[in-house]
Amino acid sequence: MSRSRFIADGVGVAVVGSGSIGSLRAEIAHRHPSVDFLAVCDTVEDRASRLAASCEADTWSTEATEIVTRDDVDAVIIASTEDSHFEPAMAAVQAGKTVLVEKPFTILADEGHKLLAAAEEYGVSIYTGFTQRFRRRYLAIKEHVLKGYVGDVTSAKATIYLTQAVARSVISRAGTTTPSVNTMTYLFDLLAWYLGGTLPATAYAAGSNKGRIHEEFGALDSTWCVLTYDDGMVANLGVSWELPEFWPAYVASMDFELFGRDGVISVKDDHRDVLMASHKPVPSPYTPDTSMNVAMLGSYMPGDWALGEHFGAMQEETHAFINSVGTGRPDPILATGSEGMDVLLVSRAVDESARTGQVVPMTWAG
């Protein structure tokens, strides 16, 4: 008798990138009981070797192509900087590997289209890392929308805010990213997921350029948009990179409201439910050089370390990816590459509207 969720053979995993997310993915993969081979990579030799030692990787390299094409690698996680996803992802696809690309799928739309075309040509699965899908509160929205408690969705409102410390970390490593492409992307994905893949018809957006992030990097400090849909639905979504470094929610705060003909679901995700104040400053998990004496614990989007183990959405997403490769069973929560591409196109349309001040149709090339 065969069991569809039994992994008979081990799974070989390669992780490209040793930043906070790449390191976390590698540590999670190292702890997965079915991972029998682990390779890590970073373009900086010292970073690659240190991560390999930390997660007891079987091998490491400064060349992504070297590890993603290995015969003992089955699954590849691309967690390099946002503007360098394309080349290692393409190499992995062409080597016949199953690939998970951290959001955003790519920054340039033409690169995303090429990745999807290659995945189809080589017959491999490619996914996008939208970790928030695996958090209980956002999964609960999906389940209850599917069960009809909301009915036809009529409108939506959502916001996501980052601290300036996190924003500086993001923009300094990938100068071509934006608040929309990097951060509001989570809201675009969740909304499209709840709507069964329906995308907006138009986007109108405006952004602020009066704050510290714009002054330092030339990027918008915030972006606010209105999305309209062919069926009459409307959504108001916003992102801000303006919270002070010492803001107690040391990484991100989110709110999400979905309105329908039969009901409404509202999530207040600002982490005020677990508040700690201490004479000993608490370092931010994402930007450990930044500390605060009052902290809203749990505001690190991937999850948290406790008792030497990592718990939370990124662990569950990474496990879902590895399990899907090992069992051959598609995971129902993982975002596909096509879904990641759709979200990228919405993000790009919003940025184009903020740049031009015009309503931008989704038929815009991106």
What are these regions (language model features)?
Residues 61, 101, 126-128, 157, ...:
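Hydrophobic residues in well-ordered beta-strands that form the structural core
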Residues 57-64:
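Conserved SAM-binding strand-loop segment of SAM-dependent methyltransferases
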Residues 74-75, 81-82, 86-133, 148:
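Beta-strand-loop-alpha-helix segment that lines the small-molecule cofactor/substrate pocket
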Residues 1-55:
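N-terminal Rossmann-like dinucleotide-binding module
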Residues 131, 229, 247, 254-334, ...:
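C-terminal glycine/acidic-rich active-site capping loop/insertion
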Residues 1-10, 75-77, 113, 121, ...:
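C-terminal helix-rich "cap/oligomerization" subdomain common to oxidoreductases
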Residues 21, 125, 132-219, 224-226, ...:
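Predominantly a Rossmann-like dinucleotide-binding segment in NAD(P)-dependent oxidoreductases
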Residues 182, 188-276, 318-327, 365-366:
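Contiguous beta-strand/loop segments that form the cofactor/metal-binding neighborhood of enzyme cores
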